[in-house]
Amino acid sequence: MKQKSLNSKGVKVVLVALLMGALSCKEAPKEQPKDVGTPEVSMKATEPFFKLSLAQWSMHKMVREDGVDPYTFAEKAKNWGFTGLEYVSALYYKELEAANFSKEAMASFVEKCNAESKKHGMQNVLIMIDGQGDLATPDAQKRKKAVENHYKWVDAAADMGCHAIRVNLSGSKVPDEWVASSVDGLTQLATYAKDKNIEVLVENHGGLSSNAVMLAEVMTKVNMDNCGTLPDFGNFCIERSKDGCAQEYDIYKGISELMPHALAVSAKSYNFDAEGNETKLDYPRILKIVKDAGYTGFIGVEYEGSVLSEEQGIIATRDLLIKAGKELN
């Protein structure tokens, strides 16, 4: 009897344990598999393949005509949904020229820009340099002077944490002469900039610089890691007349030829239709060229139209970029 009683008690204990285990499994929330974190993956799949920066030229009328302080650039760009800043040197020339571009004036420019970008959590991307001399002039002495005029901007870019300066290749209109002069001017400047960890970028910006195959040839001959292109979606007019552009390079061919050398990209825009598409430029087609080249850096919005206000044009360009970029994912 004693042995039977013990066996009976043992069976009861086992049954109770099994019942409690079943109840605890039923009530306890199921542990999610570790690889279920798909929302993040899904979110990334719907994000564009690039980051958004704002070219300050998009607000040049605000600064020059409406009296907007250029040092509010970071604040405005932040409010418009950008994360990167592309400064335009010419919008600060009033104060800098008055001080003859002294070291103190340049240091003040850098300090103010850094303070504002830090305050608003923005990234300084590059500085677009204009009016500092012709880097592609056939006159060696003038070319050297132009190169040296850019040194202070290389220094400023380095102090601001930018990765590059954008330069122009103004100068000769004779193809062979322009190529040779461009190679020399860029090599001199890129050599100086290399020690500062700054890239020297050439934008297709009129004249022979808008002849993409020639600009690509210049890049190949310079052959320096810190010298490249900044393809602009719209600046492919080689020669102008009183009626407009007399000779324009094929936009899509040009972007395709410049992208292998691209270290930055500029999204030019002029006007938009009712659906928000750019009326001259096929953004989906252009962005596919950019993506196929493996580019994943900043794309800078540069609105240059006259129908919309600058703020409206900036936002319209931003929205079109995001829309077209997402569609390529």
What is the meaning of each model-derived region?
Residues 86-113, 170-174:
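Glycine-rich, proline-tolerant flexible connector loops at the mouths of alpha/beta enzymes
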Residues 50-56, 85-87, 124-129, 165-167, ...:
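Hydrophobic faces of well-ordered beta-strands that scaffold small-molecule active sites
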